[in-house]
Amino acid sequence: FENFRKRSEKEKSQMFDMGAKTIVEKILPVIDNFERGLAAVPDDKKDDPFITGMDKVYKQMLTELDAAGVKPIECVGQEFDPDFHNAVMQVENDELESGTVAQELQKGYMYKDSVVRHSMVAVVQE
């Protein structure tokens, strides 16, 4: 009976994580839009109360995602890893070694130990 209870708890936890991962996948485009929108604000408008409010909402969303176990994948300067990165282009770069991620085109995220979205990257060509 004890084994059945443990197995049931593990299955319930896995089902919860699958549901949470699905929700995170749906929230990531919203985060992307916040980042694009805030990046497009001219420097002379960054102190506008509406813009500072939107920035605070964006940062609060990131804080809550982090607390829930969602973390961005660090990639620039790292060796390309197909488990975490999706290479969408190759670039020349004299400062980085071949096979190194030179640029992040879209941020990737992990939920706990699994990739929710791979980072879309530019890799230094050989």
Residue ranges and their predicted role:
Residues 2-35:
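Charge-rich, N-proximal long alpha-helical rod segments
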Residues 33-126:
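Structured alpha/beta interaction-core segments
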